[in-house]
Amino acid sequence: MRLLLLVGVLLAATWQVGYTRAPTFPDKSKSAADAINEPKGEHVCTVKTIVDDYELRKVIHQVVYNDTEQCLNPLTGFQCVVEKRGQKASYQRQLVQKEKYIKQCCEGYYQTKDNQCQPDCNPPCKKGKCVEPGKCECDPGFGGKICSSSCSIGTWGLGCSKKCDCENGANCDPELGDCICPSGFQGKRCEEECPIDKWGPNCVKSCPCQNGGKCNHEGKCVCTDGWGGEYCLNKCEEGKFGADCKFECTCQNGATCDNTNGKCLCKSGFHGALCEKPCSEGFFGAGCTQKCQCLNNQDCDSETGECKCIGWTGKQCDIGCARGRFGLQCKQKCTCPGLEFQDSNASCDAKTGECQCESGYKGANCDERKCSADTYGADCSKQCSCVMSNTVMCAPNTGFCRCKPGFYGDNCELACSKDSYGPNCEKQAMCDWTHASEADPANGKCVCKSGRSGANCSQPCPIDFYGPNCALQCECNGRGIGCHGFDGKCNCAPGYTGHRCEHHCPALTFGANCEKRCQCPAGVGCNPITGECECPAGRQGLKCDISCPEGSYGPECKLHCKCVNGKCDPETGECSCEPGFGGADCSTSCPKGKYGDACELSCDCSDSYCSRQTGKCICPLGKKGTLCDQPCEANTYGPQCQLTTTPSQCASTDPRNGVCLTCPPGSSGHQCEQNCPQGTYGTDCASKCACADGGHGCDPTTGECICEPGYHGATCSEKCPDGKFGYACAQNCPKCAAGSSCDHISGQCVCPAGLEGATCTRPCGVGFWGNGCRQVCRCTSEFKQCNAQTGECSCPAGFQGDRCDKPCEDGYYGPDCIKKCKCQGTATASCNRVTGVCICHPGFTGEFCHALCPESTFGLRCSKECPKDGCGDGYECDAAIGCCHVDQMSCGKAKQEFEALNGGRAKSSGATWLLILFIIGLCGVLGLAALFYRNKYQKEKDPDMPTVSFHKSPNAEDNREFQNPLYNRQSVFPDSGAFSGSSEGGVGAAPDGLLTLEEEDLEDKKIHGGGASRNMRNHDYASLDEVAGGEGGPATSSSSGVQNRRGQNSGDVRRPLLNSEDVDDDDEDEDFEEIPHENRNSTQKLSLERNSKFSEKNFKKKFLSENPYAHIPSPDPNIQNSTNSRRAQENLYT
């Protein structure tokens, strides 16, 4: 019998090697593997957890089984099937909970492949990294909870936490913070305006404007005053000024106006707004802005500034007139008698020339003393003490003695020596007495002899001087080259003769000593020096045969006419003036009221001039009429009042130029046609508005702030309250959807992210996102679909990345590539990135490409067939490429990949099948032999039918079992619980505290992740054999490969249910009670020795050690097959 069991075990093992994977057993190294996979490093927590586990529980069952007995029925071989009852012990796993301490990543962290704990952010950070659970640290330029939004305007940096430091409305780079300047500005903070030759963002574009013009932010030229044209190339014409040269100049007295602002540029001698006033006394020059630099209260020329010195001379009138001079620049000579004498007591007034006598003198020539020569005093009663012979004069008023030269002393009684001089003759004269005759007693100056000069008379006379002290100038009339120093005789030049060269050469002679004869026509002399003919007035040429051209006159026509407004006589140069002019040079216009030739005619104009030629009155600005006696009417001005002013608020205008004299508060300009410039108000626009940024300037008259739409308040500093907008916040906002707001300026609904429309009720269309859906999705896929709030791209199936521009990586598919492909590895298949469908490589098939092509097929989708007669010696049919040589590298590669993928599982080879067939045949022979000898043994040992021996207390829990471990039987629960007193029969629920099979399988699914129960059982109750065999045992149970289902039977295959031996050993020592069988007539005692049969425990040790996988299903309890009954009876006693 042991031999038969061994053969059965071997057969089962061989069957499983050929057709099934090795069963899975509990991993004894699981705890070690768990330790290896435990997280390490930071953020690791140790937690106590409750884990599910199973414990074995023995269950005692009431069973009904079939047996065979000898009977008289020959049709059944004298063996009849009878039903018998008994007890059976089985073991069932019970789910229990146990405490266990494990290491795992702390809450908010997840374990990586290298067993580190990293923070978990869900949803994941888009443009940043997860630094804490649920907290993203955004890359520069991005913000939001998951870093999916670009920084808003005015912020930048990590988490958009920094504010842009820019001016003039500039934004900054969201990553670097660099200011992005608007058009017209540059600099690190956009604080600088563009240079005059640049414009645009960061001032990189060249400005074509000329002459100081600048480009505005659109690149158009803004010209300076005085220029116009597209590029400011056109200068204002004379008489025009201002912007676009649209204003007329109205300057007088020949003044010009500035083409930029219209200011009159007066000629010298005039001033005033229109240059209509002559310079005041003491001022001169253009605009009379220069002050005369004359001293002593003297005036200057209003045009040149030259001092008009009367009674004074010098550039600044700083020198008084010399004795005997008076008048302008002291040019006039006094006519007072006696002034020609040095000692005259007369003088004249420097300004008027009136003669005056010094004090103490009288007479027409002031040469008469009031007192006698030797008396003085008011009444001439005092006697002079002077030596009158040595005295020039005794002062008539003081009696002071004025000594003659060469005398000194109080009374002039002493004479100076030859070489002394000065007051009291105290100074010594330094003369060369060889050439000096005497020294001046007054100043000690040496008096040189003729032909000598110099301080001490040691130098000869210069070339043009002669006589004592060389004081006399040679009188050669400019016709000689110096003279003799002693007597002054001239050295005459050619053409002259005489002591003083006072005589010309005689007629018709010229040259040195007048020795040459002239070669000129009769009556025409020649130059006494050169001999050239000297033409008479009005003629020119070498021979004096050409008349003077117009504009010249005189001898040889060398003189130029000075006639300004006329012609001159070619001989005399006398001017013949044009009408309206007079004077020697015709430069004098007719005086006011005169006109015609020589200004002889008179005109009768009222306070105006008349034409010098025609006598027609020329009215000044502001006058009109034939005689210019009528003033301009209101709103007219200019010459003859022909110009009209534009209607304005001006109270009165200047009739000369139309400029408003007094503009009302709030206006400016020539005609008060302009409001005050932005930001100013009041009279002369002198006050500045005090309005905030929300103001659009102020009222030019009152200064009251004019608020921009959306603002209100005295200074326009307050925004409109909620629900209001527009000017003065007078308009009501529309009903915007919840979550949106009304713009305080325009009244438009300001939609939040994801909404658009007039009232923010319409979600963003495809391809748009953000506030008001103004942002365009940056996704590159053809769908352009992104999150309406954040702009995050919603990638279609098959794409991923921030912009959905990256295809799914291998092994992933679907929207955003978040689904993992179920294909069995990349070696056997590729996964469709859109649908996830596995696309099998050649040689593989199945939904997940997990199987090789069936035998005799190969290629893509296993669509090709191998040759029916084989590939030939040394060749095989590869599942991928078909027939190939076994030594070819790629031959058999698909099979290798399949085996590697399935852990080495492969189809059984032909040798395995031969071994199986051999074992089956051997088992058949041994089985027949065993059956023959068994029947023979039974007949010889005990011809009677056996009885079953039960314990005397069969209802005791520990004795509810059969003691024959080899008996084939079905374990069955009573219908309503075998141990609760309910009715018996059928399969019922598990006793209290135990799990039913369904509950057990359900708990097993919870632990092991769903799917089929890991027990892989199809019978009602687990036996100890199955528990010992691991978690499930073999997947198949018959040679036909048909899996048994619960409540089904496949042929004659049976499931031996082995009784447990976990009961106490004392149970084996108890006696057994004979229980009569229902169909027997006599009771027999069957005494079975404990050492003559297997206990269940010994059998399990023996049987399971030889074959841990052995498991043969129990038969269906309803089968009443005689063969089964007979086999059961035979097995009972084997």
Curated annotation (Swiss-Prot):
FU repeat boundaries on the chain: 629-682
Residues spanning the signal sequence: 1-20
Cysteine pairings via disulfide bonds: 45-106, 71-80, 105-117, 121-130, 125-136, 138-147, 160-172, 166-179, 181-190, 203-215, 209-221, 223-232, 249-257, 251-264, 266-275, 557-568, 561-575, 577-586
Protein name: Cell death abnormality protein 1
Domain EMI: 41-123
Cytoplasmic compartment residues: 934-1134
InterPro entries per record: EGF-like_dom, EMI_domain, LE_dom, MEGF10/SREC1/2-like
Any single biological process term in GO: establishment of protein localization
Post-translational modification comment from the UniProt entry: Phosphorylation of Tyr-1021, within the YXXL motif, is thought to initiate phagosomal formation.
Basic and acidic residues composition-biased segments: 1087-1098
Sugar attachment sites: 66, 345, 456
Chain segments carrying region Disordered: 941-961, 1024-1134
Functional note: Involved in programmed cell death/apoptosis. Acts by recruiting ced-6 to phagosomes which enables actin-dependent cytoskeletal reorganization and subsequent engulfment of the apoptotic cell corpse. Has a role in the association of ppk-3 and rab-7 with the phagosomal surface which is necessary for the incorporation of lysosomes to phagosomes during phagosome maturation. Activates the expression of unfolded protein response genes, which are involved in the immune response to live bacteria.
UniProt keyword annotations, A-Z: Apoptosis, Cell membrane, Cytoplasmic vesicle, Disulfide bond, EGF-like domain, Glycoprotein, Membrane, Phosphoprotein, Repeat, Signal, Transmembrane, Transmembrane helix
Subunit structure: Interacts (via C-terminus) with ced-6 (via PTB domain).
Record's compositionally biased regions (Acidic residues): 1061-1073
GO cellular component: cell surface; phagocytic vesicle membrane; plasma membrane
Location(s) in or outside the cell: Cell membrane; Cytoplasmic vesicle, Phagosome membrane
Short sequence motif named YXXL, residue ranges: 1021-1024
Extent of motif NPXY: 964-967
Membrane topology: Single-pass type I membrane protein
Organism of derivation: Caenorhabditis briggsae
Main location: membrane
GO molecular-function term, one example from the UniProt record: scavenger receptor activity
